[in-house]
Amino acid sequence: MSDVEENNFEGRESRSQSKSPTGTPARVKSESRSGSRSPSRVSKHSESHSRSRSKSRSRSRRHSHRRYTRSRSHSHSHRRRSRSRSYTPEYRRRRSRSHSPMSNRRRHTGSRANPDPNTCLGVFGLSLYTTERDLREVFSRYGPLSGVNVVYDQRTGRSRGFAFVYFERIDDSKEAMERANGMELDGRRIRVDYSITKRAHTPTPGIYMGRPTHSGGGGGGGGGGGGGGGGRRRDSYYDRGYDRGYDRYEDYDYRYRRRSPSPYYSRYRSRSRSRSYSPRRY
């Protein structure tokens, strides 16, 4: 019986030994499986984290680039605006300067109240019958004269009611202005002052140069002369001299507006007429 027990015991040990090597690899396999799974998960997580970081960085770079470009464009536009504003005063000055004779006449209005002393005196408010000889007799009492010039109308040949007296010395012109200002000459009270222009305005003829719109005095022959179409006679300096030029300018402006309307107005008028006379459709 002892031999049989020993054999049985040896068989059990051999079975247990044969089972144990087969069991251990299963554990090793499970360990290897768990180990292989966990690094793959870690690598995937790290990759996704790195991707999200790279995306966030690229987005932040894009946003920063956009902000930079916006701020840069805004600064450039602000610079352009500031440059354009800096040129506006010079542009306004250029536009304000006009080369018309009316603007040149208006430039003297600021210093007309207090002109600078000079050798040229302007005599205003003269009668139509006062000549250069009469003025020379009056003003030669105060000192030697270099010239006397009565301003006549180029077309009619009549006096325009003012003249220029030229002295050789300023002291004589001062004395003449103080004493002759307000005196009566040929029934008219004259005004004497320092002249600003020192000569007559040649562009202003003194009468209306356009076509006569109403009947008036008949025109002269080849010598030129005659009335200008029912105009008013005024002898004072401001009426016959400077203001007559303004009246002529206003008449010309009115005549131009009356004969040649603006193209926008003509278009609007033609459209309104075509619409008003168009037949209605029922």
Curated annotation (Swiss-Prot):
Subcellular compartments: Nucleus
Region (Disordered): 1-118, 201-245, 260-282
Alphabetical list of SMART domains matching this protein: RRM (SM00360)
Entry-annotated residues carrying Phosphothreonine: T24, T88, T202, T204
Entry keyword set: Acetylation, Isopeptide bond, Methylation, mRNA processing, mRNA splicing, Nucleus, Phosphoprotein, RNA-binding, Ubl conjugation
CDD domains: RRM_TRA2
GO molecular function: RNA binding
Pfam family, any one: RRM_1
RRM domain sequence ranges: 119-197
Cross-link Glycyl lysine isopeptide (Lys-Gly) (interchain with G-Cter in SUMO2): residue positions: K198
Region (Linker): 198-225
Modified residues (Omega-N-methylarginine): R232
Domain of life: Eukaryota
Family according to the record: Belongs to the splicing factor SR family.
Self-association state and partner proteins as the record states: Binds to A3 enhancer proteins SRp75, SRp55, SRp40 and SRp30. Interacts with ILDR1 (via C-terminus) and ILDR2.
Name of the protein in question: Transformer-2 protein homolog alpha
Protein species of origin: Homo sapiens
Gene: TRA2A
